Swiss-Prot record:
Gene Ontology cellular component list: cytoplasm; ribosome
Gene transcribed to yield this protein: rimM
Organism: Shewanella sp. (strain ANA-3)
Disulfide bond positions: none
Predominant location category: cytoplasm
Stated role: An accessory protein needed during the final step in the assembly of 30S ribosomal subunit, possibly for assembly of the head region. Essential for efficient processing of 16S rRNA. May be needed both before and after RbfA during the maturation of 16S rRNA. It has affinity for free ribosomal 30S subunits but not for 70S ribosomes.
Subunit-level organization: Binds ribosomal protein uS19.
Description of its domains: The PRC barrel domain binds ribosomal protein uS19.
The family this protein is said to belong to: Belongs to the RimM family.
Protein name as it appears in the record: Ribosome maturation factor RimM
InterPro entries: PRC-brl_dom, PRC_barrel-like_sf, RimM, RimM_N, RimM_N_sf, Transl_B-barrel_sf
Keywords, sorted A to Z: Chaperone, Cytoplasm, Ribosome biogenesis, rRNA processing
Length: 176
């Protein structure tokens, strides 16, 4: 992995399962199985990313557990508990033109149709009905806002997303 590539975090390793080094998996993917579509994984252990392969995985009750290459004892698995699971950015699936990964939206400037800079996307929240952009307002916001919440509804409030230019054009009143 080159030093300028930041892995995309897809989950984390949980507690041990059994005595043969299996670990519970917490996945941040849409479905828990989705994390197993990617191989190899990168594991962040002691601040360093290293490559690891999943040998096999299965459901264990309501949890998902996995056997990782080179992890054959409970003691070794315990050393990996709470380590992040990542992949290289180029391992991500290509998306249709009007879909975006959250990581690509974070850091984008949000500009309304009147040209007002509303701030920068700080994080995104999944609400069930639609995602919501949490926009950190500029230090000298004319409306005294610190943060804004904008529904990510393309065509209604989100007019254009320029991932390369790191800008999102919105139809939204900055005072709301």
């Amino acid at each position: 992995m080159s030093s300028n590539q930041q892995p995309v975090v897809l989950g984390k390793l949980g507690s041990c399962h059994g005595i043969k080094g299996w670990l519970k998996i917490t996945a941040y993917t849409d479905s828990v199985e989705g994390i197993f579509d990617y191989s190899p994984w990168l594991i962040k252990e002691n601040g360093e990313w290293r490559e690891v392969k999943v040998i096999q995985w299965r459901y264990q009750g309501k949890a998902v557990v996995a056997e990782l290459e080179g992890v054959t004892t409970r003691e070794r698995a315990q050393m990996l508990t709470n380590c992040e699971i990542g992949i290289l950015p180029e391992q991500m699936n290509d998306l249709p033109e009007d879909e975006f990964y959250w990581r690509d939206l974070i850091g984008c400037e949000v500009i309304n149709t009147n040209g007002y800079n509303m701030g920068v996307v700080d994080q995104i929240v999944e609400t069930g009905s639609n995602d919501v952009l949490l926009v950190k307002a500029n230090a000298k916001d004319s409306f005294g806002k610190v943060e804004r919440m904008l529904p990510f509804v393309p065509g209604q409030f989100i007019l254009k997303v320029d991932v390369q230019g790191k800008q999102i054009l919105v139809d939204w009143d900055p005072d709301f």
